[in-house]
Swiss-Prot record:
<dbReference type="GO" id="GO:0042742">
    <property type="term" value="P:defense response to bacterium"/>
</dbReference>
<feature type="signal peptide">
    <location>
        <begin position="1"/>
        <end position="20"/>
    </location>
</feature>
<dbReference type="InterPro" id="IPR017853">
    <property type="entry name" value="Glycoside_hydrolase_SF"/>
</dbReference>
<dbReference type="GO" id="GO:0042593">
    <property type="term" value="P:glucose homeostasis"/>
</dbReference>
<feature type="glycosylation site" description="N-linked (GlcNAc...) asparagine">
    <location>
        <position position="428"/>
    </location>
</feature>
<keyword id="KW-0081">Bacteriolytic enzyme</keyword>
<keyword id="KW-0325">Glycoprotein</keyword>
<keyword id="KW-0964">Secreted</keyword>
<feature type="glycosylation site" description="N-linked (GlcNAc...) asparagine">
    <location>
        <position position="423"/>
    </location>
</feature>
<keyword id="KW-0326">Glycosidase</keyword>
<feature type="domain" description="Ch-type lysozyme">
    <location>
        <begin position="21"/>
        <end position="231"/>
    </location>
</feature>
<dbReference type="GO" id="GO:0005576">
    <property type="term" value="C:extracellular region"/>
</dbReference>
<dbReference type="GO" id="GO:0098609">
    <property type="term" value="P:cell-cell adhesion"/>
</dbReference>
<dbReference type="InterPro" id="IPR002053">
    <property type="entry name" value="Glyco_hydro_25"/>
</dbReference>
<feature type="active site">
    <location>
        <position position="116"/>
    </location>
</feature>
<protein>
    <recommendedName>
        <fullName>Probable GH family 25 lysozyme 3</fullName>
        <ecNumber>3.2.1.17</ecNumber>
    </recommendedName>
</protein>
<dbReference type="Pfam" id="PF01183">
    <property type="entry name" value="Glyco_hydro_25"/>
</dbReference>
Length: 480
């Protein structure tokens, strides 16, 4: 009898494992080829594609990606990051109507409304944000679209407060615990008591494509497909982001939450914005380490990395992109604070004697960091840099920076370096700096000693872009 029971349990376990599904989500800055999708289909049964980015609007690559994904054997869902303070179409009902119109004839499973934080994206009044999100979801439902919500335990209350009226819609949540299951119960927010999909890992790479990883129970092969003109039976890929590190698209709080987002061209973990090495509920996108900011404000959810710093000044709706250094909103430990801004920011890869500018929190080891203020600990490296800011397309100069040495020694010398980075869709922010270190002092937490030096820097920075962009929830995320 005992052997029979064990045999039955074994069969049930095997069936359960076999019926579970793997999915990936990609940001609007990612445009995989047919061969990429064929490769991805060997490891996944679903793909969720970002179709709308903040104030930038529709991702024109969606129709061709959907067609190629279906040909590769993948079921397709879409996600949209909308925000009340983004440029472009600011009315949520109008944005949804425009999106649905552009998706006319495109068959997909579920349209996920991505709810996550990003710099300058939302009103400071939670009730206003809640009304915005409700209108977006309800408008999509009224238009006959299968609609769900993507968010995380940390992002939801930060954005819409105690809103519970949408709990009857499917939930895709983010919790970066690298555990493809619902055992974490990270879906207990907003009135939900269950979820349909979990984003359990932020930006990583499969088949050379930057993706977030998702898990859902069951085969996911029999959901109703939405299009503006017809319905048919097809698979519904489900998605989500946030958690003890959540990602798509932005900065963190709680055990850290965030949205999704990932792009191939130097994207953030996106997507917001890599994934966190500790707990973080912020959807962030790819990048092993992140310091960045546009010299324009960003309406995209920031992307993730193992360390995070981001800030924006000026105006720009572009989600920050990843590179060797990139925008992030996700902490490498647990953090309940939104990311802080530095006095100057450049994102992307850096060459020269110093690294990327921007303020950075967390710890870094043996890495020269450039920039405004720094907290945390650093290896036996000294850093110096000038601060830089500018509005989109503008040239400005700034001077004065502090340099720090973790060992208490001071250094003198001159250094030059240039940095450039690219946003998901458009133009790059770049700047150059040169200067000699003279004298001065700086201090940081967990650092001892003093260093002296002054630096001046001048350069131009700006960001512009049109077309497809990434968001944070971490579709961040994106899932941006």
């Amino acid at each position: 009898m005992n052997k029979l029971i064990l045999s039955i349990l074994s069969v049930l376990l095997i069936v359960s494992i076999a019926s579970a599904g793997n999915g990936i989500d990609i940001s609007s800055g990612t445009n995989p080829s047919s061969s990429d999708l064929a490769c991805l289909a060997k490891q996944n049964s679903k793909i969720i594609v970002q179709t709308w980015s903040g104030g930038y609007g529709f991702n024109s690559n969606v129709p061709s990606i959907v067609q190629a994904a279906k040909s590769a054997g993948l079921s397709v869902d879409l996600y949209a990051f909308l925000c009340s303070q983004c440029s472009g179409i600011t009315d949520p009902a109008e944005a949804i109507k425009t999106l649905v119109s552009k998706l006319n004839g495109v068959k997909y499973g579920t349209l996920w409304i991505d709810v996550e934080q990003c710099n300058g994206c939302w009103s400071s009044t939670l009730s206003s944000n809640a009304q915005y999100v409700q209108t977006a979801v309800q408008t999509a439902s009224q238009l006959g679209v299968n609609v769900g919500v993507y968010s995380s335990e940390g992002e939801w209350p930060q954005t819409v407060g105690s809103l519970t009226s949408l709990s009857s819609f499917p939930l895709w949540y983010a919790h970066y615990d690298n555990n493809p299951s619902f055992s974490d119960q990270g879906y207990n927010f907003g009135g939900w008591s269950k979820a349909v999909m979990k984003q359990y890992q932020g930006t990583t790479t499969q088949c050379g494509v930057s993706v977030d990883l998702n898990w859902f129970p069951g085969s996911g092969s029999s959901t109703t497909s939405s299009s503006a003109t017809s319905s048919s039976t097809t698979g519904r890929p489900l998605t989500s982001s946030s958690g003890a590190g959540t990602g798509g698209h932005s900065s963190s709080s709680g055990a850290g939450t965030g949205g999704h987002s990932s792009t191939t061209g130097g994207q953030t973990s996106g997507q917001t914005s890599g994934q966190t090495s500790g707990s973080s509920n912020q959807p962030l996108s790819s990048g092993s380490s992140q310091d960045s900011s546009n010299s324009g404000s960003s309406n995209q959810p920031l992307s993730s990395g193992s360390s995070q710093d981001s800030s924006n000044s000026g105006s720009s709706n572009q989600p920050l992109s990843s590179g060797s250094s990139q925008t992030s909103g996700q902490t490498s430990g647990s953090s309940n604070q939104p990311l802080s801004s530095g006095s100057s920011q450049d994102s992307g890869s850096n060459s020269g004697s110093q690294g990327t500018t921007g303020s950075q929190s967390g710890s870094s080891s043996s890495n020269p960091l450039t920039s405004g203020s720094q907290s945390g600990s650093s290896g036996s490296q000294s850093t110096s840099s000038g601060s830089q800011s500018g509005s989109s397309g503008a040239t400005g100069t700034s001077s004065t920076a502090s340099s720090t040495s973790a060992t208490g020694s001071s250094s003198t010398g001159s250094s030059t370096g240039s940095s450039s980075g690219s946003n998901d869709s458009g133009s790059n922010d770049s700047g150059s700096s040169s200067g000699s270190n003279n004298s001065g002092s700086s201090s940081g937490s967990n650092n001892s000693g003093s260093s002296s030096g002054s630096a001046s820097s001048s350069g131009s920075s700006g960001s512009s872009g049109s077309g497809n962009y990434t968001s944070g929830s971490g579709n961040g995320a994106f899932l941006f």
